[in-house]
């Protein structure tokens, strides 16, 4: 009887994590579709008028007329740069490996940030050189938006698995979402085109979704 119960729990737990992995792969596919859509809009210059309208509106804000506010925005955007994200990912990897005693997850987290960022950066440069012949938006997708969506996206996806306290979970969840939105808004105000920011977000988000999805498919738990 107990043996049958144990078998039932084992059989039920595996599809649970597999369904989570499938959900993440599906979500990554949605971000991939949005990225392809943004590539098409930029490639055929449909995003140019939208970017110019947002750029002109951003220039009319008081942030561009104040050197202090501009400096604050630049410091905010550094929270999503690869120079900030890569060392921080090492700290998160050490935390997951030692404090949470999950070496596989810690190593996977660091490798995900490093490898996905390198892969997506290569794709970014390839697209930038291709689009440069057809569009004025040569900075597509934005590297900072890519880095912050990848790193903070991984943290957002790990929060439900690592933290059980619901209030703390909600605070961290919405704080990270707010930080992503704030850094993206700061990039736009500083003159980065909206299409470049959205393209970077989509690339980073699909990288985070596929990374955790692959991890769940391989290890079946976090």
Language model features with spans:
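N-terminal transmembrane-helix/juxtamembrane module of multi-pass inner/ER membrane proteins
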Residues: 2-82, 125-132
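Structural signature of hydrophobic alpha-helical transmembrane segments
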Residues: 75-86, 139-148
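Alpha-helical transmembrane segments of integral membrane proteins
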Residues: 25-27, 104-112, 171-176, 196-200
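Interfacial segments of alpha-helical transmembrane regions
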Residues: 89-116
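Hydrophobic core of alpha-helical transmembrane segments in multi-pass integral membrane proteins
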Residues: 26-41, 89-95, 178-183
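Membrane-embedded catalytic cores of phosphoryl/pyrophosphoryl-handling enzymes
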Residues: 131-222
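Alpha-helical transmembrane segments in multi-pass membrane proteins
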Residues: 108-112, 116, 120, 200, ...
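Aromatic-anchored segments of alpha-helical transmembrane domains
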Residues: 36, 114-122, 178-188
């Amino acid at each position: 009887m107990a043996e049958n119960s144990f078998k039932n729990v084992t059989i039920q737990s595996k599809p649970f994590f597999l369904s989570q992995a499938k959900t993440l792969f599906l979500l990554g596919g949605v971000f991939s579709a949005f990225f392809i859509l943004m590539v098409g809009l930029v490639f055929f210059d449909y995003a140019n008028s939208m970017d110019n309208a947002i750029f002109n509106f951003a220039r009319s804000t008081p942030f561009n007329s104040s050197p202090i506010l501009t400096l604050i925005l630049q410091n905010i955007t550094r929270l999503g740069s690869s120079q900030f994200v890569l060392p921080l990912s090492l700290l998160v990897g050490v935390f997951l490996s030692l404090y949470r005693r999950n070496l596989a997850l810690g190593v996977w987290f660091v490798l995900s940030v490093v490898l996905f960022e390198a892969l997506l950066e290569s794709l970014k440069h390839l697209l930038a050189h291709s689009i440069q012949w057809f569009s004025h938006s040569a900075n597509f997708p934005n590297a900072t938006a890519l880095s912050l969506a990848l790193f903070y996206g991984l943290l957002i996806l790990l929060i439900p698995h690592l933290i059980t306290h619901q209030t703390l979970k909600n605070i961290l969840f919405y704080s990270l979402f707010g930080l992503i939105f704030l850094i993206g808004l700061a990039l736009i105000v500083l003159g980065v085109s909206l299409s470049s920011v959205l393209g970077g977000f989509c690339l980073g988000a699909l990288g985070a979704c596929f990374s955790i999805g692959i991890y769940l498919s391989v290890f079946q738990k976090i």
